[in-house]
Amino acid sequence: MSEAPFNYAVFQRDEWHELVVPAADRDTSHVTPKVLGEIKAFNDQISMSDVADVYDPLVHYIKLRHAQYLRDREERDHFLGRAIKPSPFVIGIAGSVAVGKSTTARLLQYMLQAEYGEQNVALTTTDGFLLPNEELQAQGIFDRKGFPESYDMPALLEFMNNVKDGDEVVRSPRYSHDISDVLVNEFDTFKRPDIFIVEGINTLQAAPNSPVYLSDFFDLSLYVDAETLLIEHWYIDRFEALLQQAKEEADPTNFFFPYTQIPVAEAVAGARRVWETVNLPNLTDYILPTRERADLILHKTMGHGINEIWLRKF
């Protein structure tokens, strides 16, 4: 198991569970097994104990950081003698493919929305800023999909600048995992959210040929972590589940449909090659090195259970 860097305080799950608010006084009744089933990403795992032990204390920590953010803005406005346009509190969530980032992002959005009521908690992913498959193929980098050069980083940075600048309306391109491509002329629209969650493998990376990090726009950053062999297991397990789903649906437009036309063992072998030649190098060379830029790291073990929380000290 990897060790936390010296500038992180490490909390075991049971220690984290007891922070801030006594466990007996917490109310997570709005998060039900049915809600979890709707929130969790395909083939991911999450339990009610995860909500109580990990995510509820995490929400309290986010609320603390959000309150501090608002105080800082108020004091700055007082110092400057003028009010600055409202700007959302932005949370970035990073980590490997198949590690469970989407589930973490959706659950935090749900729990924060319940906490903040009428305030708007929005969520987007960086997937929509991938170059379309046609463009990746034209540039000869389709096999590098997910690597830094496969994203339209100028567009993503402009989007985040508009979000943080408090623009009235911002739009992000939509991505479909069914066809594994950006959807043409389809967008998600956000109207000045109070809290904005941005999830993606590249959220802590620097843009190529740019001095700006995407994380420069974040007020709090999280990294979902696990041992590489575990992530590989989850990746293959998810592929097999998606393969079975594609076989049952028999939809030729589904990205996984062609794999249903060959023997399962051959399809799984192909998925392992993709892991070894694409996802593993991307994790090793570009994603994992950004882990220590995160303010907080959720470390997972078998069954997607979170066993440690690493909190940056400085």
Feature map (PLM): residue ranges:
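Conserved NTP phosphate-binding and transfer environment spanning the P-loop NTPase/kinase superfamily
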Residues: 2-26, 33, 39-48, 203-314
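Conserved nucleotide-sensing/catalytic segment adjacent to the nucleotide-binding pocket
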Residues: 39-54, 122-125, 129-181
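Glycine-rich phosphate-binding loop used to anchor ATP phosphates in small-molecule kinases
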Residues: 69-72, 81, 85, 155-216, ...
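Pre-Walker A (Motif I) flank of P-loop NTPase domains
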Residues: 85-91
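Glycine-rich phosphate-binding P-loop
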Residues: 91-110
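Post-Walker A helix-loop "phosphate-sensing" segment adjacent to the P-loop in P-loop NTPases
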Residues: 110-122
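Hydrophobic "anchor" residues on beta-strands that sit immediately upstream
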Residues: 123, 195, 221
